[in-house]
Amino acid sequence: MLNLESLFGSVLIKGWCRVDVQRLEEAWAARAGAREARLVAASHVPAALSLLGIVCPGDRLVAFADDFAEAFARGFDACDIVLVGDPSVAAFAAASEGFDVSFEVEGPHLWWFVNSIGGFGLCVPDLRTLGRAAREAHALLVVDNTVACVFGCDPLRLGAALSLEALDRVCAGKAPRKLVAASVARSQLKRHRVDAAAECAHALLEGCGLAKLDLTADEAGVLERGLDSLDVRMQAHFDRARALAEYLAANELVRDVYYPGLSSHPNHAVATGILEHGFGPAVEFDLIERSAGDLFDALPEEFCTSSAGGSTARLSAPRGKQGSTIRLFAGTDDPLVVASILDNALRKLATL
């Protein structure tokens, strides 16, 4: 275990300990393979992107986030927001037509936003192809890496100029408040070529004017311990997600099981080259003639109320409780027990 005080530094202020946040950001940047990182207190990644202030009036933000579109309805005033229906190069290129931009810091700027795993059906975009196409279009590719996390995907290596990640899972669901890490790509390419997109993103982040985040020692301790145990915990999340996906895929009481590790997933081939150590902690499926609310009522309460990123399997309803879609985030609990509880609830619904 790394020593928190020696790694991050601290000073005593009014009886409590305030952390040297810059050292903590440097530790995250090293883990993410980033040139620089910033920590932001925000409820989710789009909110953090807004708070950073790097997407400016006059910019165009093209985003694939069909399960989180409302997050882009606020915080991007005077920006041209375009939501696309799929995370393909063709969709992003079409939405970018007629917008004349460059990588000059003054702007305006063109932003492309995707999740490494996200959207309905848990899509996995081809980040390599998107990264190349973004640079050709003079766009800055931003990746929300929350679901896959830094353990399961390396967006900056694959071509993103900026990677943002909500730290719920990194902190094992124990963070006192919601935090997001924003990481900018290194600008040095092969053969001493400079990556203009990364240089632009770095300049924007440097000049954003956002004050350094205040973290208490307790908050920093949770994040430091989370980083120290991240690989072991995330491998457990990923392995349990695979087991639960295989159980659900064979279950006649549900349909349309989406998990990038299943050969039936439309992005399975892409995912094998984009994701690492497995295929993420999430599984999505649809109920047959029942609503998400019906299933939640038949399950123990902790399945729906446990902390995001924690050790207990957690279910949500991305289309609302009246919809039939369920998203399961595997914990580190016994997948056989989780499958048994799910099976009992599904069979109960089938008899009603």
Where are these regions (language model features)?
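Conserved PLP-enzyme active-site core in the AAT-like
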Residues: 4-7, 12-18, 23, 27-250
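Conserved residues at beta->alpha junctions
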Residues: 42, 329-332
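Short intrinsically disordered coil segments
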Residues: 195-199, 300, 345
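Conserved C-terminal alpha-helix-loop-beta "cap" of PLP-dependent enzymes
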Residues: 253-330, 337-344
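Generic C-terminal helix-cap and adjacent flexible tail
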Residues: 344-352
